[in-house]
Structures are given as structure tokens and as C-alpha cells.
């Protein structure tokens, strides 16, 4: 399960808009919001794109997308 709180923080800190992210991922803003609310999951290719666009380290990526403990 995605740590959406950490992901939203990373998005905010990057200064990238949700519209830009959705366009870059090739999905609608609605689909992005569903992923940000853990209604649907991010695909592996989307995680790679987010890592690059948001300038995440491998550790940050792992904490956001692959951490077992999510509050």
C-alpha cells in the first residue's frame, strides 16, 4: 500500500502540479486522485516515472511505495 501522506508531501515539496503529474503518467487527474487515496494502485512504470519526476531517492521510493507499515 502506498504511503499517500509521504507521497503527497513529496509532490508538494517538488512544486509539481497534480495536472502535470497526471499528464506525465498518461492518466486523468481523477485516476491520479484515486491512486493518491489508495483506491487503485500505482503500476511499476508509474512508480519509476514518479521517482524521476519528483527526484526521489531509492530509499524515499521504497518508503513511499513498498513500506508495509502505513498509517
Feature locations, PLM:
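Short, charged recognition helix plus adjacent turn
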Residues: 6-10, 14-15, 59-71
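Helix-turn-helix DNA-binding elements, focusing on the entry/boundary residues of the two helices
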Residues: 18, 29, 47
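Short alpha-helical "recognition helix" segments of helix-turn-helix
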Residues: 20-22
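Recognition helix of helix-turn-helix/homeodomain-like DNA-binding domains
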Residues: 27-42
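DNA major-groove recognition helix of helix-turn-helix/homeodomain DNA-binding modules
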Residues: 45-60
Amino acid at each position: 500500500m502506498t504511503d499517500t501522506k509521504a507521497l503527497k508531501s513529496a509532490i508538494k515539496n517538488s512544486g509539481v502540479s497534480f495536472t502535470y503529474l497526471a499528464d506525465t503518467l498518461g492518466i486523468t487527474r481523477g485516476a491520479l486522485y484515486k491512486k493518491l487515496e489508495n483506491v487503485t494502485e500505482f503500476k511499476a512504470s508509474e512508480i519509476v516515472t514518479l521517482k524521476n519526476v519528483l527526484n526521489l531517492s531509492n530509499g524515499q521510493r521504497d518508503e513511499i511505495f513498498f513500506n508495509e507499515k502505513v498509517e
